[in-house]
Each structure stands twice: as structure tokens, then as C-alpha cells.
Amino acid sequence: MNTQPADFSAAQAATSLTQFRSAAPLVHCLTNDVVQSFTANVLLALNASPAMVVDPEEAAQFSAVADALLINVGTLERTRAEAMRAAVNSAHQAGTPWVLDPVAVGGLTFRTEFCRELLTWKPAAIRGNASEIMALAGLAAQGRGVDSADDSLAALPAARELARQVGTIVVVTGAVDYVTDGERDIAVTGGDSMMTRVVGTGCALSAVVAGFCSLEGDRLSHVTAACYVMALAGQQATSVSQGTGSFIPHFLDRLYTLRAEDLA
């Protein structure tokens, strides 16, 4: 295992983005109430198809036919947990890749226990901030809701261990994003602090990661490409935005117009 995270090339991101736009994956998002519309728009901008099917019986049916599933526990409650269990079980049986976004895990008991329960169904990837990843790995962390008081690099050892234990890819997002399968580590720079001042960029990234997990080929590379594309779009949107209000439309526009030749 590399002790120093490798960099990720624009050419690698370009290859994955081309594959993603061509595949146009159907992504089933069981996500939180605050970010549903924004998440759907981000997926649409990248030529994916979002769906939010929340009834437990229907969620199970839909996850079996979707290309990927996102589980985001931001606004978790008991009925939604039932739907998530059903969807994850169905996805697992169908071989559908699913991604866990463990929002505020470590700070609240029900969601922490629930997310640890879901790990038995082997997610294709886990995407969270440093505090969430450290808490999910069973380490002490400092977080407040969706905000993290821990540095993403400090959480990398926990991410590696979690990836090895579960057999998954773990993404720790922050000023620098780190992606690991427990053996290989990749660093993704870029993005902008503006992305932390609007609701939903991290949650939307998790949905994009789910879509990229459905692609054929090296999953670690595809997941890293998802982070690269979102960070680049955020950085470019910030450069032409006046503030958070104008950032969101510029961000969606950049995702919509971003092509492989812009990356390579």
C-alpha cells in the first residue's frame, strides 16, 4: 500500500466522464428531504437519470432494476429506514451497486447504529466527511451535524481500515478529497470553500459516486473521477459567481457543459 496518496490525472477523469455520459445510469436516490431537487438536477446535468422512490415495497422493486442506489441518512426516520433496508437488500441480491452517505453518524445514536447495520450488505462505496468516516470506523471524531471538525487527511487511516473491513471504497471529502480501497489511496484537489456554503454539494456528490460505481472497469478510478468532476465544476463555478445565490446555477451549468476534452 502506498503511504503517500497518488494524484489523479485529468485524462483518467475524462475517460470515466465519457463512459458515464454514454451509459446515462438510472440512479435510485433514497436521500434526505433537503437535497432531493438539487441532487436530481446534478445527476440530470451529467446525463444520468435520477429517481426517488420511497415506499418500502416500491423501493425494493425499483432498486432491483436501477443501475445504482444511493442511501443518504440525512433526514432519517423509522419509516424511511424500512424503505432503505428493503432497497439495500434488493440491490444486494440483484448485484446493483449502492453507496452509503452516513450523514451525521457518530453524533446521533439511531443513524449510527443503522448505518453500521447497513454495512453488512456491502456498499460499493461510502462517501462522508472526516468526522463521519472516523465515527463509522469506530474512532472518536469531532463533528456537528453535516459539518466536520476533523481534517480529511487525518481520517485517511480510518478510511483505509473501514475499506478493508467492509470490502468497499471509501471517500473522505474535505479541502482535499481522499479515495481509498484500503490498499490504494488517491488524492483529489480542487473544489472551493464556496461548495460548503450551499446545501447539498456533498450529498449530490454521493449520488454521482453511485452512478459512477455502475460503470464497467476499475471502480476506484471511476469513484475518484466522480470527485474530480464535481470539484472541477465547483472551482470553475466559483470563479464566475458573485456569491452562494449565483453559485448553484453556474455549478449546474458547468456540469452540463463539461466534456472530456475539457479535462484531458
Swiss-Prot record:
User: What are the coiled-coil residue ranges?
Assistant: none
Name of one Pfam family that matches: HK
EC code:
2.7.1.50
Residues at which substrate binds:
M52, G200
Quote the Gene3D superfamilies the UniProt record gives. Answer: 3.40.1190.20
Q: Does the keyword section mention Transcription regulation?
A: no
Q: Which reaction does it catalyse?
A: 5-(2-hydroxyethyl)-4-methylthiazole + ATP = 4-methyl-5-(2-phosphooxyethyl)-thiazole + ADP + H(+)
Q: Which domain of life is it from?
A: Bacteria
Q: What GO MF terms are annotated? A: ATP binding; hydroxyethylthiazole kinase activity; magnesium ion binding
Q: Of which family is this protein a member?
A: Belongs to the Thz kinase family.
This protein is called Hydroxyethylthiazole kinase
Organism encoding this protein: Pectobacterium atrosepticum (strain SCRI 1043 / ATCC BAA-672)
Query: Which lineage do the record's taxonomy fields give for this organism?
Result: Bacteria, Pseudomonadati, Pseudomonadota, Gammaproteobacteria, Enterobacterales
* Gene name tied to this protein: thiM
